[in-house]
């Protein structure tokens, strides 16, 4: 396969992972609670943050398979990717211009930025079979995730330094630095998306169609594929299992920083843990794929599920920053591996000519899973904070009761 296309494709993970680290997992949850929302009521902030994540996931889940079918019919994978990436980039830039106390606007902009991020990932994933073959698809998938962790880790370190030492960057205070951190994510995302847009070629499996014809034929294809899915037992079984275990993974990714903040850890400690996850995950993902190739991809997923069960169990007992860093280390060991193997295994069992549509179903179930975890986490926090005086105990319970990875 063309190495330029492989690295151009993988570099998009480097580009958009800045949103996942700096915005989604890092600064937005804390900034939303302390600047845009009410800093005296963390439980309410957690609830609205979980609700926002769930709304974004639900919208993407409903659109994913239909847009995937349309993209397959009209060879619109790259076009749809660019559209959603543009939406995410613009909304992320917009986070840097929202005034204090404007939590409804901040939440709405965050929802749209998350839709852009998640929507683009559908079509990014669907291009994986186009830039790889049966021999290297596992390594290419792992390369994307590992570069994502490295790129996200580099930018969050820069952003953390900006917020910790704003004067050195010519900024007034940490608030201004945080807003510029959001802007830097948008710029980073846009800049490193360019190679994919220029060098990754999208194969055509159908005759060229107008957008209107692609919509009509795509809807017909979606209906037919949905019916055929009942006959494809391997794909259907995998999707069901994926729906069950990815919820735990997504909930930990999206809500870990807010969980740590609720436990009373300071921002520096939380950011240090996020950087640790990124750096460990960069190496762990590349190693994990080698282990999975040795023991089998299916067993590799089982190993990741077991790892996340241990992580969630350990999270219940977190009391000190040392405990939190141990949990962060464990997350880094398993997070990228289970995501990468899931993607590459799924690519092996679906027809390439319908990759966008099938990845639509893949992302639909992933997003439906992400609907329940964050909103359950926020709801449990809100409920327990009203009946338990010890905020730390409430935080422990909400993590433990969020859906854990299962098979």
State where each predicted segment sits.
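Conserved small/polar residues in nucleotide/adenosyl-binding loops
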Residues: 400-407
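Juxtamembrane intracellular "pre-TM" segments in multi-pass secondary transporters
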Residues: 3-6, 203-238
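Helix-to-loop junctions at the C-terminal end of transmembrane segments
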Residues: 64-75, 284-296
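Structural signature of the two symmetry-related core transmembrane helices
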Residues: 79-93, 300-313
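Helix-loop boundary and gating motifs at the non-cytosolic
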Residues: 2-57, 236-241, 245-263
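Central cavity-lining transmembrane alpha-helices of secondary-active solute carriers
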Residues: 51-67, 276-284
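Helix-loop junctions at membrane interfaces in 12-TM secondary transporters
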Residues: 97-108, 316-327
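Loop-to-transmembrane helix entry/capping segments in MFS-fold secondary transporters
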Residues: 43-46, 134-144, 267, 352-362
